[in-house]
């Protein structure tokens, strides 16, 4: 299944393509990359082998491994300082969504003078950047979920405000992506499931977002079909390289498709990820049926089209909801937010305000108010779907 793609960027796909990483560096004239990853991966044999292979091929790689889950502005600033201190000339963003997001943001911020928050994805903020001082990026995902390797943004937590900000620039899109399923074979079932549901949320919300974008719609539909065919297999048989390859592909497709927009699944998720430190894929999985049933009157026709494309037994809105609920059950995922967040730690008013202000809110099929966010949170906590 090895192949080379040129959309949405250069993507080298297939088993053992990680061995081409030094060639990717040479293709981009990167002689001294900074490999950005988390501390756990940095100690793994995968990263040890990658670093050795790069050095054997004359690439003078440096390592930054302080990335944390739900990464912060401090992560980015520290990494950018390390990049400049060591005179690096490119970034290898290596890992799950956090490693990829921080790596991309380090490449971006290494040459900027304004603070990172000035580049939040609002209006034309991205035009404030000096685009000539953005380092080249190679992305190597080790999970199949965020699709950050195919995206033009990073999600970074502002520690002062407690808000997860989407930082955007067209040059966040990596120049080369390596999709090697072997790197995801060791993922535990729970992480495989959560990241897979993140990929589903991306494809699903992109398809349901309003606006005319047949290209994104087509990619999103096929992404959902791949997830339907392969997610359970990837979870139940993690050594199945074909399943892992397909899930990596579906994740990249989701990120490509959501250029069209996202929606309330993500709007509700980002605040609980920031304030309650809940895994993003897990929160997306929890919120999914509540948001879908809330939006039912404006998305029902689209949902039926998805059912038809996925060849579900029950091609109706309720049939699709039952498919989601059944999938979550098979993945051993919670039905209610209260199963992962204690009521005393749940600041409904603050979360609702943050959700409404989230950039993803604009892509929701139905215009939303703070009261809408509040009631969706309440239903998610109680486990009661909207009728």
Residue locations for each model-derived region?
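C-terminal charged capping/lid subdomain of soluble metabolic enzymes
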Residues: 303, 307, 311-387
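N-terminal small/polar loop signature for handling phosphorylated ligands or for N-terminal nucleophile
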Residues: 42-115, 233-244
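Glycine/threonine-rich beta-strand-loop-alpha-helix active-site module
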Residues: 74-179
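An N-terminal, well-structured beta->alpha segment
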Residues: 1-64, 385-387
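Carboxylate- and glycine-rich phosphate/diphosphate-binding segment that chelates Mg2+/Mn2+
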Residues: 152-260, 371
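C-terminal catalytic subdomain
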Residues: 262-319
């Amino acid at each position: 299944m090895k192949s080379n793609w040129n959309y949405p960027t250069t993507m080298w796909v297939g088993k053992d393509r990680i061995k081409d990483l030094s060639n990717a560096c040479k293709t981009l004239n990167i002689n001294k990359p900074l490999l950005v990853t988390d501390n756990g991966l940095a100690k793994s044999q995968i990263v040890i082998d990658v670093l050795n292979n790069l050095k054997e091929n004359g690439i003078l790689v440096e390592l930054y491994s302080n990335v944390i889950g739900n990464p912060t502005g401090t992560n980015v600033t520290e990494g950018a300082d390390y990049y400049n201190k060591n005179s690096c000339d490119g970034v290898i963003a290596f890992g799950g969504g956090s490693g990829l997001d921080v790596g991309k943001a380090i490449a971006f911020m290494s040459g900027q003078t304004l603070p990172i928050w000035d580049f939040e994805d609002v209006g034309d903020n991205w035009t404030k950047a000096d685009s000539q001082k953005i380092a080249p990026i190679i992305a190597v995902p080790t999970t199949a979920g965020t699709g950050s390797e195919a995206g033009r943004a990073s999600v970074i937590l502002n520690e002062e405000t407690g808000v997860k900000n989407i930082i955007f620039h067209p040059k966040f899109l990596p120049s080369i992506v390596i999709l090697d399923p072997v790197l995801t074979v060791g993922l535990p079932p729970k992480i495989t499931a959560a990241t897979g549901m993140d990929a589903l949320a991306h494809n699903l919300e992109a398809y349901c977002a309003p606006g005319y974008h047949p290209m994104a719609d087509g990619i999103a539909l096929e992404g959902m079909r791949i997830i339907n065919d392969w997610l359970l297999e990837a979870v139940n048989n993690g050594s199945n390289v074909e399943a892992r390859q397909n899930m990596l592909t579906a994740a990249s497709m989701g990120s490509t498709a959501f250029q069209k927009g996202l929606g309330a699944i993500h709007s509700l998720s980002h605040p609980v990820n920031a304030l309650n430190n809940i895994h993003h894929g897990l929160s997306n999985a929890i919120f999914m049926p509540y948001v879908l049933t809330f939006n039912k009157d404006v998305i029902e026709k689209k949902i039926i089209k998805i059912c038809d494309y996925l060849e579900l037994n029950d091609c109706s809105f309720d049939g699709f909801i039952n498919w989601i609920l059944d999938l979550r059950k098979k993945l051993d995922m919670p039905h209610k937010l209260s199963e992962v967040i204690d009521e005393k730690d749940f600041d409904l008013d603050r979360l609702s305000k943050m959700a409404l202000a989230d950039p993803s809110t604009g892509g929701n099929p139905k215009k939303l108010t703070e009261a809408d966010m509040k009631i969706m949170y309440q239903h998610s906590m109680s486990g009661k779907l909207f009728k």
